[in-house]
Amino acid sequence: ISKAAKIKSPDVKIVVQEKQLGTGHAVKQAERLLGKSGKDILILYGDVPFIKSETISKLIKARKTSDIAVLGFDTKHPGMYGRLITNGENIFGIVEAKDATQEQLNISVCNSGVILGRADLIFDLIAKIGSDNASAEFYLTDCIELAAKAGFKSSLVLCDEKETIGVNSLEELAQAEELFQRAKRIEFMEKGVQLNSPETVFFSFDTEIGKGTVIEQNVVLAPAVTIEENATIRAFSHLEGCRIFPNSTIGP
């Protein structure tokens, strides 16, 4: 992960949580790099890949009128997600499912884990977190109740539940891939790319396709593929690391 991050951003700073003592403890590992900063920090998760830039922009907007902005989602199947204790757009606490009362388990607005706030405030709150809970861990979520008791305001920003899907198993990885492919198919068709059998065409994260291109069934576009305008990709083609020029026809 560190190597991949440095390829994308050579100046990135890496810290490691040697012992898994909870999400609060994990964030605390970055305190020596960020703790004295008066700047905002955005806490994201590597296994939650679908959060949109527009959603981050909403968090930034909410942060302008509150001390902390929290990303949540409303779901019919809250399961083991933490529940948000709210009053309108204000959040007064987050309760993990395993520590929740039956009444709290009935809450449908859940925590995504994504938080935006000023670095020094976040780390001051983390310093006050205890581990007296069902997992004996330091929950980052406890910061919100501590903030409320100290007079700080935490605001709720809601997003689509699909944006918060995590990848913690091979089954969830397959589900995430399915969501990704479905979104890319819609994206390209809206841009004027003709997919003759959309469910049989597979894209990569960096695929680029020009308007007017026709892609037939059972096509795989591996990484580093650019297809310019008005090309035709025949059925059963597998492309990778290539550029297809305008008006070209490519077959398997």
Language-model region placement:
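Residue-level signal for inorganic ion chemistry
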Residues: 30, 47, 59, 84, ...
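Left-handed beta-helix
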Residues: 135-252
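Conserved N-terminal catalytic core of the sugar/cofactor nucleotidyltransferase
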Residues: 1-44, 48-58
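Conserved beta-strand segments of alpha/beta enzyme cores
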Residues: 11-13, 90-93, 153-155, 194
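Conserved core of the sugar-phosphate nucleotidyltransferase
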Residues: 51-134, 141
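Residues that scaffold the ATP/ADP-binding catalytic core of kinase and kinase-like folds
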Residues: 4, 94, 125, 167, ...
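Short loop/edge segments at beta-strand edges and connector loops
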Residues: 16, 45, 72, 158, ...
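Short, high-confidence coil segments that cap the C-terminus of an alpha-helix
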Residues: 38, 64-68, 152
